[in-house]
């Protein structure tokens, strides 16, 4: 049984969503720490910057927790004062996605364990395969994804995996926290973005970072985006001659399988991806 300390550095959670997440997590066998007081704050942030930062520091400093679990995404991670590197790397595991892509990049760079997967409030909506995938990732066990590609029997060797929300990754450009994409499988997903915004974010990443040197780009779900968003993204990636796969079970829907930043992965000629765990 895994114990999670809860934190919030982004937007506040609606009471019904919070309650549903708590009930789902407890029913799945997780032990949970206390909910930070600032989670109910009004406005677009779950409390002021210091209150949100304190919730993260408390979660990371816990000696009883197996991992620190973000309650919700939204916005706020990038403006939250972060704890020292010793808390980020001291054997800590951090779980979240969406706005938390920012924190995952920092935790990974500091030597901590960054897991891209459901936040607490989205865990209530996660399908059973996604819940099993989260347990497997937390345990460091291998997982398999079936991807699709139009590259025929394209097969690439093992490489580490990173990625997350496209819009958030684009905002990391020009900061000390922007990850190195070269030689990695990079997983991208997004939610509620118009075609031109997706185009702009990806184009900016390709021109202003080393994303064009990625081992390959793996596209997840583009939820609540206009129809045709995923094919558009695939065309944009292929225009840069970067190997591309689609239909990764990652995103803002019921299907959101966890992956660990930096874990090794390989893809065979049939599009089966093996994430080897860590």
Model-derived segments and their meaning:
Residues 1-64:
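ATP/NTP phosphate-donor binding region
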Residues 177-229:
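Internal helical hairpin/lid segments
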Residues 13, 17, 160-193:
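Conserved beta-alpha junction segments in alpha/beta enzyme cores
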Residues 73-89, 232:
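Short Gly/Thr/Asp-enriched flexible loops that form oxyanion-binding sites at enzyme active sites
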Residues 67-78, 97:
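N-terminal glycine-rich "phosphate-gripper" loop used for MgATP/nucleotide binding
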């Amino acid at each position: 049984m895994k114990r999670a300390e809860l934190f919030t550095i982004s937007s506040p959670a609606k009471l019904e969503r919070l309650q549903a997440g708590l009930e789902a997590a407890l029913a799945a066998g997780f032990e949970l720490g206390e909910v930070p007081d600032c989670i109910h704050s009004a406005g677009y942030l779950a409390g002021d910057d210091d209150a949100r930062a304190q919730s993260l520091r408390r979660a990371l400093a816990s000696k009883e927790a197996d991992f620190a679990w973000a309650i919700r995404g939204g916005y706020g991670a990038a403006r939250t004062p972060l704890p020292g590197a010793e808390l980020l790397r001291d054997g800590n595991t951090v779980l979240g996605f969406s706005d938390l892509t920012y924190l995952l990049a920092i935790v990974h760079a500091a030597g901590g364990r960054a897991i891209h997967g459901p936040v607490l409030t989205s865990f209530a909506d996660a399908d059973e395969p996604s819940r099993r995938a989260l347990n497997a990732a937390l345990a460091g066990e291998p997982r398999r994804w079936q991807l699709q590609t139009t590259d025929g029997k394209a097969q690439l060797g093992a490489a580490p995996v990173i990625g997350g929300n496209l819009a958030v990754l684009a905002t990391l450009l020009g900061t000390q926290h922007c990850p190195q994409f070269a030689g990695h499988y990079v997983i991208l997903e997004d939610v509620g973005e118009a075609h031109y915004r997706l185009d702009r974010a990806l184009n900016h990443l390709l021109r202003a970072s080393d994303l064009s040197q990625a081992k390959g780009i793996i596209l997840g779900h583009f939820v609540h985006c206009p129809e045709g968003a995923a094919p558009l993204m695939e065309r944009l990636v292929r225009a840069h001659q970067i190997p591309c796969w689609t239909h990764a079970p990652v995103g803002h829907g019921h299907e959101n399988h966890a992956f660990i930043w930096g874990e090794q992965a390989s893809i065979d000629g049939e599009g089966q991806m093996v994430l080897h765990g860590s």
